[in-house]
Amino acid sequence: MSHSAEPLPMTARRSGPLTGEAQVPGDKSISHRALILGALSVGETHITGLLEGQDVLDTAAAMRAFGAQVERLGEGEWRVNGVGVGGFAEPEGVIDCGNSGTGVRLIMGAMATTPITATFTGDASLSRRPMGRVTDPLELFGCEVTAREGKRLPLTIKGASEPVPVRYKTPVASAQIKSAVLLAGLNAPGETVVIEAEPTRDHTERMLAGFGAAITTETTAEGHVIILKGRPELKPQPVAVPRDPSSAAFPVAAALIVPGSEIRVPGVSRNPTRDGLYVTLLEMGADIRFENQREEGGEPVADLVVRHGPLKGVTVPAERAASMIDEFPILSVIACFAEGTTVMQGVHELRVKESDRIDAMAVGLRANGAEVVDTQDTMTVHGKGGLDGGATCATHLDHRIAMSFLVAGLASHQPISVDDGGPIATSFPDFLPLMRGLGAQID
C-alpha cells in the first residue's frame, strides 16, 4: 500500500461457521525493534517471521537511510548489517514513517544521541499525533528538536554531539516513550534510567538484553525501574519474530462471535505485557485453549484453539489497559455479542492513537444498533448477545478500527461496511485472504 492510496470500501456479511488455521503475521512491535537493534549492532543480524506490513517496511527503509545494509532474503526473512551504537550516518533525504507511531518514535530515540540531523515525516494520521511526549525526554540527552506547532510531524532532530545520561519518569504508560529513551541511552555514557508507574510491553528490554546490552529492571517504591548501561557493543542475534497477539485478536474475535466456529491460531506471543485481551476473554467465559506452550526468541509463545460459545460482560480494570491498549476496539465489538455490561477503564491513551479510537468505535457501534457510553477514560458496552448491523463506519485511516468493524459484520444481522479498508495493510497485509480462508464473507 502506498502512503496516498484511494479509499478502499469493504463490506462484511453474516458468515457460516469459521474453521481452519489462521497464520497471523509476525509481531509488529518486535519486527520494528529487530530492524533497529540489528542496525545498531556490529555485524549481521538474521530475522525470520518479520511482519512485512507498510509500517515495518518504512522502518527498514529508514535503517537503510541511516547507513545500515538491510535486505530481504525471502518471505519474512531479512538480513541486517549494522553500523553499531553511535554509527548512524546522516540521511540524505527525509525519513517518511508513513502511519507508524512506533516506527517514528523508536527511530527518533535511536538517532537522538548521534551527532547527525534528520527530518521525520508521516501520513495525515501520524502527522496529527503528539510527538512531544517522546521529544521532550530526548531533549534531556542534549539533542535539539524543531517541530510544527503542537510538537507534531514534520519534525527535525539535531542529535546530541555530547549526550548525557538521563533519568526519566514517564508521565503516561507508554512503551514507545520508554523505548525511545532506552534507545537514546545506548549512545549516552553512564546509566540511563526509566521509571514507569506500571510496567508496559517489555519487548525493548528483552531484546536489548538479547543483543548484549547490560539492562536491569526492578520494582521499587518509585515504580517499575529500568537501568541501562550506555555505550555497549551490541552483538548481532538471530531473531525469530513470534506472531502478533494484536493481529491474532481479529480471527480470535470472529471465531468467538460467529456460531459454530472453531479455529486454530499457531505460534502467538503470550508475552504477559501484551496478554490483557486474552485474560479478559477468559473472564468473559471464552472457549480458548493455549496449546504447545514454548519460548521463541525470548518470548513465550502458544498455539490458540478458539471455539464459539456464550460470553458475559465484565469490567476491565484500568491497570490492565497497558497490556491490551491496541485490543480495546475489537473487545468493544466482542462485548456487543456478550450478555450483560462490559466496562473498559483506563482507556484515555486510545484517544491519541491512529485515530480517537474510543470515539470511532462508539460512533460506529451505535450506528449499528449497539448501546455504548463513553467518557474521557472509560467505554461501556451494554451487550445484548448480538448486533443489528446495516451501517457504514468511518475508519479514520485506522487499521484496527477497520478490522474491528469488519469482524463485527461477520456476526451482525445486517452487513457492516467500512469507508476505507486500505490502512489494514499497515499491520495485517493478508487480513482479507486469511479471513476468507476461514469462511468469512468480506468483499
Curated annotation (Swiss-Prot):
Superkingdom, natural source: Bacteria
GO biological process: amino acid biosynthetic process; aromatic amino acid family biosynthetic process; chorismate biosynthetic process
Region (Disordered): 1-25
Cross-referenced InterPro entries: Enolpyruvate_Tfrase_dom, Enolpyruvate_Tfrase_sf, EPSP_synthase, EPSP_synthase_CS, RNA3'P_cycl/enolpyr_Trfase_a/b
Catalysis: reaction(s): 3-phosphoshikimate + phosphoenolpyruvate = 5-O-(1-carboxyvinyl)-3-phosphoshikimate + phosphate
Keyword Cytoplasm: yes
Residue sites binding phosphoenolpyruvate per the record: K28, G101, R129, Q176, R357, R400
Entry GO MF terms: 3-phosphoshikimate 1-carboxyvinyltransferase activity
Record text on subunit structure and interactions: Monomer.
NCBIfam families noted in UniProt: aroA
Protein name as annotated: 3-phosphoshikimate 1-carboxyvinyltransferase
Organism: Paracoccus denitrificans (strain Pd 1222)
Source organism phylogeny: Bacteria, Pseudomonadati, Pseudomonadota, Alphaproteobacteria, Rhodobacterales
